[in-house]
């Protein structure tokens, strides 16, 4: 627990003396964290969970309101998983009066460097209820051969 109170942490881990802290105060952060940018950050900063099972690496991205046609999953350079997409702004009709516009729009791109022990040719993606699931199967790791050596002497 820090001896100095933090006014900028928003309930996240913050410690100015910890070099590995996730949230050290940034004076320029306030310029980009207006309520407007926070509202639009839902799609622009798509949240992704990455878990590893014994069989695969599984990525889950929350993409509420997006259709699968608006999302792309690609493998770059044989080692980078790229998830990208775009939500378009609804067309305005000159006869309509908008009282509130809160749904986010914009583009997003997330990249993840994959480990060497994966089967790039067997990557699968599925989208259900606004959640994209990308499964990257693991390649079987070859167990090292152990050979006993006789000690002479």
UniProtKB/Swiss-Prot annotation:
InterPro entries tied to this protein: A-crystallin/Hsp20_dom, HSP20-like_chaperone, Small_HSP
Q: Which GO terms describe its cellular component?
A: cytoplasm
Report the record's Gene Ontology biological process terms.
response to oxidative stress
Q: Name one Pfam family in it.
A: HSP20
Task: Report keywords, A-Z.
Answer: Cytoplasm, Stress response
- Major localization listed first in the record, in broad terms: cytoplasm
Q: Which domain of life is it from?
A: Eukaryota
Residue limits of the sHSP domain?
A: 39-153
CDD domains tied to this protein: ACD_ScHsp26_like
Give its localization. Answer: Cytoplasm
Provide the assembly information: May form oligomeric structures.
PANTHER family registered for this protein in UniProt: HEAT-SHOCK PROTEIN 20 FAMILY MEMBER
According to its UniProt record, which protein family does this protein belong to?
Belongs to the small heat shock protein (HSP20) family.
**Name of the protein in question:** 17.6 kDa class I heat shock protein 2
Source organism (scientific name): Arabidopsis thaliana
């Amino acid at each position: 627990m820090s001896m100095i109170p933090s006014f900028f942490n928003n309930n996240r881990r913050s410690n100015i003396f910890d070099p590995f802290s996730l949230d050290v105060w940034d004076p320029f952060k306030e310029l980009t964290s207006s309520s407007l940018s926070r509202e639009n950050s839902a799609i622009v900063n798509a949240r992704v969970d990455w878990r590893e099972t014994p069989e695969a690496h599984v990525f889950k991205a929350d993409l509420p309101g997006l259709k699968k046609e608006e999302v792309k999953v690609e493998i770059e350079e044989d080692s980078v998983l790229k998830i990208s997409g775009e939500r378009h702004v609804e067309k305005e009709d000159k006869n309509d009066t908008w009282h509130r516009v809160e749904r986010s729009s914009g583009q997003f791109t997330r990249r993840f460097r994959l480990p060497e022990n994966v089967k790039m040719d067997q990557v699968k993606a599925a989208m259900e209820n606004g959640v994209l699931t990308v499964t990257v199967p693991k390649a079987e790791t070859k167990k090292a051969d152990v050979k006993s050596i006789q000690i002479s002497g």
